[in-house]
Amino acid sequence: MRLRFFALGTLAFAVLSGCTGMTPTPGQRQLLLVANDEKQSWTDAGAVVLAAHGRDNVQVIDIGTDPLAPRNVVTLPLDNTIAGPPTNLAITADEKLALVANSLNVVEENGVRRQVPDNRLFVIDLAATPPKLVDTLAVGRQPSGLSINRAGTLALVANRADNSVSVLRIAGQKVTLIDTVAMGESVSHVRFTPDGRRALASKFPNHKVAMLEVEGEKVSYNKVDL
């Protein structure tokens, strides 16, 4: 049996000029996040093979200063998984902060490895030289898709195993969990509308999209599904 071992990478990149509708100019910094899951692989038959955790990492790459020669700014040893991406990474519009959710961990019991839900959200200071981890928050179980509003003041995280959405306040480099919205069903991703007044959450198992109302920092779910 042959195993295909390779780093599973997921991407998230946000360009400040892209968020404002402008075209980036040469030499302007643009950041790309690459999350590498180093613990999951497959056999040729498609069976999942799990390795011990502890080798995952997140890379911060500058793709704007010299587009022909992207530069790895820093590699941070942070747990993450291919099961949650590609939506479990986000960068604020001003490129000063990044959020990375870790959906699943690998545990070993009686010689058998299996995946279990995690609840960690990593906060990365992109303005630091080099960028660094500044906080780790506990959100819901199996945090998956997440998004940040255009103002960079509020973030939402869909928690698959908790049937909930976490609401996070962003103030400078400080990120705070301020509320948890019960969704009644498993949600895999959540995203703000462009005006920031609503958000849409995907209820993947039941093929539904839930609508959330956003008023300032208050996020509510009035049982409206599409």
Where are these regions (language model features)?
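Positively charged n-region of N-terminal signal peptides that target proteins for export
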Residues: 1-4
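Bacterial N-terminal signal peptides
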Residues: 7-18
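Predominantly soluble domains enriched in secretory-pathway, periplasmic, or organellar proteins
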Residues: 19-226
